[in-house]
Amino acid sequence: MTATLLEDLEARGLVHNSTDRDHLGARLAAGPVSVYYGCDPSADSLHIGNLIGLLVLRRFQDAGHRPVALAGGATGMVGDPSGRSEERNLLDADTLDANVAAIKAQMARILDFDDGRAVLVDNRDWTADVTLLDFMRHVGKHVTVNQMLARESVRARLASEQGISYTEFSYMLLQAHDYLWLNENLGVELQIGGSDQWGNIVSGIDLVRRVRGRAVHGLSWPLITAPDGSKVGKTTGARVWLDPAKTTPYRFYQHWMQVDDRDVRDYLAKFTLLPTAEVDELAADHQEAPERRRGQRALAGEATRLVHGQAAARAAEQASEILFGGSPVEAGAAALAAVAGEVPRAPLPSDAELAAGADLVPLLVEAGLASSKGDARRSLEQGAVSVNGDRVEPGREIRADDVLHGRHVVLRKGKKSYAVLVRDEGEENSPKPGSQVDAP
């Protein structure tokens, strides 16, 4: 398995730069290698841009190597200028501590840390007590300013109006020091990262060679970019987070369902652990009948399962089916809860009201599906209202046997306007009444 790992990464489009390919391949074939990937805790969650790196680490682990996942508590205090047009806001220590704890937990969902099969580290543990003079003597003297100025990220910032601070200019030295420390203490021989990190990776390789006289390796993958050219997961608009409290599993699932047909094969290869033969089969099937969206469904299901687990992936799939015209009657309780988290909702009538039959008209108004009782009656007369997927007529009442899994009744007006009656409302930050869910 190890001998073909590089070939598998290349087949997935996950090799952009690397140190000598033959030497790297030979080292991987010779035995287990410790390989590291780092994430700076600039937020309290990782995003899908980080997911590629974690999945590459997972591929190395599945091939018998040892991942070293680094949460950059030290480098996060400085900020990486790579791919940025302006200075980062510096975070305080308490915020960084909370962010590091959060992203460590997310890393543990992708990698197996049992019995030392993977290692989780924080670079603040070996950086916090290093004095400035020690750092300048043991790291700074091995790196020339010429080398630092040659890095694309530095050149781009120097050419900008804002320029670059000494803090961010020094970032590559801190990351190079990480590689040196990890090599000396954990035997790390390979660093991986996105192509925007290649300059930082090379700085670490050079430092290990100069200080320890050892040949170590680096590998980067091409950046996945959004239509506006920004890095996936790092756009200035709505990010797609791995934390379900920031991006619900349903919205995470829908992100992948909305992938452009032209990107399906590439995303299946990079954002899932499916074998490349299965990826190619799905891509070919999708190309023949893109309207079936088999590729997007496989992508959404696999990516959501990896990040949120099988139950959440299934609930997101069922919620999607409901919100795009499917019947909620056969859906599970988790799927209905997911739907209730995405659309307007109103309290379910009491048991006594349900026993007597609750008038649907005021419920449509309360749920935001009608502006008035008159509007609600007109919608019913026009046959535009459904209860649990079944079109209803004027005079319809909500009764106990309409309640799904003891908690939910799904209402729909027209094709896209949904609301849910919920037995115990309780959720804060609910969508505003009258919002719509648009199909991809």
Predicted regions and their residues:
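NTP-dependent nucleotidyl-transfer catalytic core
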Residues: M1-Q197, V202-I205, R212-H217, S230
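Conserved nucleotide- and phosphate/pyrophosphate-binding catalytic cores
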Residues: R210-P440
